[in-house]
Amino acid sequence: MRRFVSLRAVLISLSLALAPMLAQAKPVWIDVRTEAEHRQNHIDGDPLIPHRNILAQVTERFPDKDTEINLYCRSGNRAGKAKSALESAGYTNVKNRGSVAEAREARNP
C-alpha cells in the first residue's frame, strides 16, 4: 500500500509539472491583421494580435519559444513581418500561413 501511495504521488507531481508544457504543445494560430479586418472575416477561436504588437503580446502569452506559431493576415505580408520579429526574438517554430483563406485551408486540408 505504501508503494502505491508513493507511486501515485510521483505520478501526480509529474502530471502537474508537465501540464504547462503539454498545454503549449498545441499549435497556436494568430490573426495579425487590424481589428476592423478581423471583425469582417475571422477564424473563430484564433486570437487577434496586430502585427505591430506581435512581439510584446506573444512573449507574454506564449513564453515557450518552441511553440508552433502560425501567423496569417490578408495576403501574407504582415504575417511575414511578424514572423521575422518573432524569429529575431528567438522563436524557433513560426510559420507564415499567408491569407485567412490559406490559413483555413492549411487547418482543414
Regions found by a protein language model. Give the residues of each.
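Bacterial N-terminal signal peptides
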Residues: 2, 9-19
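Rhodanese-like catalytic fold shared by cysteine-dependent sulfurtransferases
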Residues: 2-6, 25-28, 35-68, 77-109
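Short, surface-exposed ligand- or partner-binding patches at beta-edge/loop junctions that are enriched
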Residues: 72
